[in-house]
């Protein structure tokens, strides 16, 4: 890391000298806002009598770049405001403006039609199968990032219970290591279990990009199912501090804080954010997977019980210091993330048996470096470097031997006509042998992207990703010296090249990608052996090396105004992660170092139409279909044998591991409709339907495979989401805003085991959420109220684990702007 910093700083200094002779240009940035401070989204800011223009973002912020020094007239227009013009003298490298405007009393039919693309539209029409989630409204409500993702077309968030439980993301049948999770372009796993999508509040997020299939250049990696990239807020044009706190059912308290400061003269910038979450997760379960074992060994299903031993507490902070929009860098930041989490483990893979006294603790210290420069060394060249070094610790304790029931009391048996607690088995904990496991990880992750525009509409880029993970596993109940510690090392190197083009008046956009990956794993397990009278330490090494090539392409064609045909294809590999190879005891995952890379051949084709404006009405349509062929799919192992009546407990597993399935095939389609009326009513409807089938026709003995053509278990394959939002202005107070929300979700029944079984099929899930938010006239305070799962429906997820029923919460948001 030290050498990386020195090298990059040298590069930065060199680039600053290399550009001293360039022409004098500036940036004009700021915010268009109405009375009360509310930002005006998608307003046009134009320098009159020039071709320089830009749209403000969803919060009213804008940036005009590369403006030659001189005098200009600025014209600001939008359908919802009265046009405004004013003069400006550009005589320094950065000008920051606050443009106050008046609301439009009526629509002027002679107003010039403004065309342009928002960041969301720009990403969604590049040819990738991608959806962009904007978080402006969600940040004001008591919603977490995973809930936003779960409402997105084609995305299913798989969670093993309540807040803080293990999460896996399914993108139209692809999950696990096939799906990448990124935070500002860096793998989220680098930051540790404490800093995950459960804990990062929407208030800290600018947008979420959900890719299905081929990934853009800056996210190159061993992923074939797609990726989720969380882009944190970076704007520092206005010094501000935002705080939020919420309290709700199950004794759940959440709070977050974020702030930014920028020195307008020299570009010095600081950003700070943090969060705290606490919950008892004490919700009630009552469905078919909730069971009680009586003293006479009879099993009672549909047992109503309140969850226990499920406390979750997490605290984290992110600190960054650097420079923005200066001569030698568009962005340069050094950062530090710290997080700490305590999480009780209430049960194993399924809910069959509750645990008491089994818990995990996590800590992470993460150091980051980000550098970004457009027109680096020469005009048209861009350099982006992200580097992370993290130190992560995981502590798992399981030392209680007593078995428990879901009423919170010890499991009983009848002996000599008397009910007594089931005697603990010597040396056994809740899930297996008693243990106190301490896992330490040291992770280095560096991504470099160098892009060059060789001609208008033609761009090439070269990307390199290097990631290493060193892991040490210790059992503190059986302490040994450092020579007997199990060590694991993983190194991934990926080189990727991309060519992007925009031709035919920018109607046709293509992206060609090729990559080469080198993956190496080494695990050393020492053991003490005696040969004659001599005791020695034997080091058993398991080493693997594999090299893989991949390629892909995307295309987007603007057939007619507002209609885009989008397609992509990819042939690539994905390798197992460190947790899949070497286990994850806090998540009930066993090791399987024999996993081999998974190969996938994917095809996607779809369209996006809109937004079509008809008077006060806006309509956007999206549809896509996909076909995915997988080989050696890396998947969680599920029960394969037929569940026999009277032996349903055979399907109750407390732990599992990742395995390689044979050939698989996933085909399906998805669609979405978005309707907006008068910028007050917003309605959304989306669905996803696919069949993910096992296609290995014969087993290793050449006999017909029992699982051939069966649906892969534990995967919801048909989901529907719908939501409605309505805005009311000037309610109770002038210039206030009241938003009312409604959301509904549907999940079709799916099996948690391979062979059909009534007892291991989740029922139909249909749930409703309602909520509201009230923004005070000064625009600084927002109060929101949310009622989730309002009808107290049964909701299930991974391996039939029941999720919370009805819950209510209230949230306060407060923003302090322009404090310096």
Q: How should these model regions be labeled?
A:
Residues 566-570, 598-659, 665:
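Membrane-embedded beta-barrel scaffold of Gram-negative outer-membrane proteins
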Residues 33-35, 44-46, 77-81, 91-139:
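Short, acidic, small-residue-rich periplasmic hinge/interaction motif at the N-terminus
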Residues 322-325, 330-340, 362-533, 546-552, ...:
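Face-selective signature of the C-terminal outer-membrane beta-barrel domain
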Residues 504, 517-519, 525, 620, ...:
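Gram-negative outer-membrane beta-barrel transporters
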Residues 65, 186-213:
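Short acidic/polar hinge/loop motifs at secondary-structure boundaries
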């Amino acid at each position: 890391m030290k050498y990386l910093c020195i090298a990059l700083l040298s590069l930065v200094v060199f680039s600053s000298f290399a550009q001293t002779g360039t022409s004098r240009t500036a940036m004009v940035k700021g915010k268009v806002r109405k009375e009360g401070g509310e930002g005006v989204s998608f307003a046009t800011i134009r320098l009159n009598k020039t071709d320089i223009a830009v749209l403000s973002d969803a919060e009213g912020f804008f940036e005009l770049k590369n403006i030659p020094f001189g005098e200009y007239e600025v014209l600001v227009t939008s359908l919802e405001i009265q046009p405004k013009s004013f003069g400006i003298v550009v005589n320094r490298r950065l000008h920051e403006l606050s443009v106050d405007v008046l609301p439009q009393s009526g629509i002027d039919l002679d107003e010039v039609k403004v065309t342009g693309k928002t960041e969301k539209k720009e990403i969604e029409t590049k040819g990738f199968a991608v959806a962009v989630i904007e978080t402006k409204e969600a940040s004001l409500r008591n919603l977490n990032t995973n809930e936003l993702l779960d409402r997105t077309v084609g995305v299913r968030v798989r969670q093993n219970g309540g807040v803080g439980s293990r999460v896996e993301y399914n993108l139209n049948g692809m999950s696990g290591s096939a799906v990448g999770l990124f935070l500002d372009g860096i793998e989220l796993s680098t930051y540790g279990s404490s800093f995950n999508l459960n804990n990062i509040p929407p208030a800290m997020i600018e947008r979420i990009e959900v890719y299905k299939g081929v990934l853009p250049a800056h996210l190159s990696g061993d992923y074939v199912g797609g990726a989720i990239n969380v882009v944190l807020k970076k704007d520092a044009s206005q010094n501000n501090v935002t705080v939020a706190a919420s309290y709700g059912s199950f004794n759940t308290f959440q709070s977050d804080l974020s702030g930014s400061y920028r020195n307008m003269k020299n570009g010095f910038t600081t950003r700070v954010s943090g969060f705290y979450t606490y919950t008892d997760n004490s919700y009630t379960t009552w469905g078919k997977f909730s069971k009680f074992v009586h003293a006479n060994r009879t099993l009672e299903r549909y047992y109503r019980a309140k969850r226990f031993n499920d406390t979750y507490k997490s605290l984290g902070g992110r600190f960054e210091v650097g420079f923005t929009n200066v001569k030698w860098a568009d962005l340069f930041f050094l950062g530090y993330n710290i997080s700490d989490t305590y999480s009780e483990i209430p049960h194993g893979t399924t809910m069959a048996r509750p645990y008491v006294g089994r818990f995990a603790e996590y800590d992470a210290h993460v150091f980051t470096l980000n550098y970004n420069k457009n027109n680096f060394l020469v005009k048209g060249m861009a350099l982006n470097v992200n580097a992370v070094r993290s130190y992560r610790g995981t502590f798992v304790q399981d030392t209680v031997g007593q078995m428990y029931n879901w009423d919170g009391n010890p499991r009983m048996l009848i002996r000599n006509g008397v009910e007594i607690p089931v005697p603990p088995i010597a040396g056994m904990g809740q899930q297996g042998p008693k243990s106190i496991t301490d896992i330490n990880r040291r992770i280095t992750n560096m991504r470099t992207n160098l892009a060059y525009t060789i001609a208008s509409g033609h761009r090439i880029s070269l990307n390199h990703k290097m990631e290493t993970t060193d892991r040490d596993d210790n059992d503190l109940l059986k302490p040994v010296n450092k020579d007997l510690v199990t060590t694991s090392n993983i190194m991934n190197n990926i080189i990727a090249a991309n060519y992007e083009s925009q031709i035919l008046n920018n109607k046709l956009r293509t992206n060609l990608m090729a990559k080469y990956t080198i993956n190496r794993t080494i695990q050393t397990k020492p053991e003490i052996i005696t040969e004659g009278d001599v005791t020695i330490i034997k080091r058993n090494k398991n080493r693997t090396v594999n090299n893989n090539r991949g390629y892909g392409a995307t295309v987007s064609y603007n057939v007619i105004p507002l209609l885009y045909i989008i397609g992509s294809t990819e042939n690539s590999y994905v390798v197992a992660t460190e947790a899949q190879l070497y286990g994850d005891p806090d998540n009930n995952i066993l090791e399987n170092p024999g996993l081999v890379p998974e190969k996938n051949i994917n095809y996607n084709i779809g369209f996006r139409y809109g937004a079509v404006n008809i008077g006060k009405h806006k309509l956007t349509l999206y549809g896509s279909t996909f076909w995915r062929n997988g080989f050696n799919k890396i998947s969680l192992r599920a029960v394969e044998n037929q569940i026999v009546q009277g032996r349903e407990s055979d399907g109750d597993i407390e732990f599992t591991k990742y395995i390689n399935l044979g050939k698989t095939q996933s085909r399906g389609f998805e669609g979405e409709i978005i309707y907006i009326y008068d910028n007050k009513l917003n309605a959304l409807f989306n669905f996803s339907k696919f069949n993910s089938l096992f296609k290995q026709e014969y087993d290793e003995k050449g006999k017909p495979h029992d699982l051939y053509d069966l649906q892969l278990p534990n995967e919801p394959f048909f989901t529907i989401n719908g939501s409605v939002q309505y805005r009311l202005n000037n309610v109770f107070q002038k210039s206030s805003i009241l938003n009312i929300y409604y959301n509904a979700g549907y999940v079709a029944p799916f099996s948690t085991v391979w062979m059909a079984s009534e007892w291991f099929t989740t029922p139909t899930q249909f749930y409703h959420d309602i909520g509201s938010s009230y923004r005070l006239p000064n625009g600084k305070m927002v109060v929101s109220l949310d009622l989730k799962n309002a009808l107290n429906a049964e909701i299930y997820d991974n391996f039939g684990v029941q999720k919370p029923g009805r819950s209510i919460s209230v949230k306060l948001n407060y923003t302090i702007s322009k404090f310096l």
